[in-house]
Amino acid sequence: KPQTDAYPELPENEDLTMHLAEAARIKVVPHSLIHLADGSLGYITRRIDRAKRGEKIDMEDMCQLTLHPTEYKYKSSCEQIAKAIAAYSSTPRLDLVNFMQVLLFSFVTGNNDMHLKNFSLYRPKALYQLSPAYDLLNVAIANPKDKEEMALSINGKKARIKLADFLKASDTMGIEQRVTLGLINGLRDAMPAWIDLINNSFLSDEMKQNYLDLIS
């Protein structure tokens, strides 16, 4: 992904946000920044639907699993994804917790673009499981005019989301509230590492401060 005039510093933003996820013990796809021919930074990831020798690995995104055409990728809810995970994952209880962790992380880091195509199940070996996270990005600092907080509704809401909404969604998804609260504490514990990563990132000083202000 190269730089874009419409949304400055997106490659640096996405690579940093993926590193923040790793610091919070969220599995993510392999990723990196690279220098492009014009000297600017670009963002790359490695495909996880191909094995080392090029064999195809089964992978279905949530548009496919919930029978939504791509143009309706925003017309669903987090709870609907949870239903698909419960129905198709080989390890649904674990994957539901991992899914909630990504939802919480995305909310805290200003990512309101986690639509149906940004969650997938794949089968790297014999079992279907939630794929490592991808397309993690702080949209709030890249596009501050967008006031929605979630791409997909949670507890019927896309904005003004509170802890109670995540806890209610946890109940709906079959996740114990204490587990969700534990995930939130895990994100809090990662905050010192996040601050270091942001301060040492390739973002401009202004963008660094915007990111720090958002998560503080």
Regions found by a protein language model. Name each.
Residues 1-75, 122, 178:
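Conserved ATP-binding subdomain of kinase catalytic cores across diverse folds
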Residues 6-24, 76-142:
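Conserved kinase catalytic-core segment
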Residues 36-38, 99, 182-192, 201:
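Small/polar glycine-rich anion-binding or flexible loop at a beta-alpha turn
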Residues 59, 76-79, 96-98, 182-183, ...:
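Short coil/turn segments at secondary-structure boundaries
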Residues 61, 65-84, 122-181:
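Catalytic-core segments of enzymes that bind and process phosphorylated/nucleotide-bearing substrates
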Residues 87, 128, 172, 189-216:
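Regulatory N- and C-terminal appendages and interdomain linkers associated
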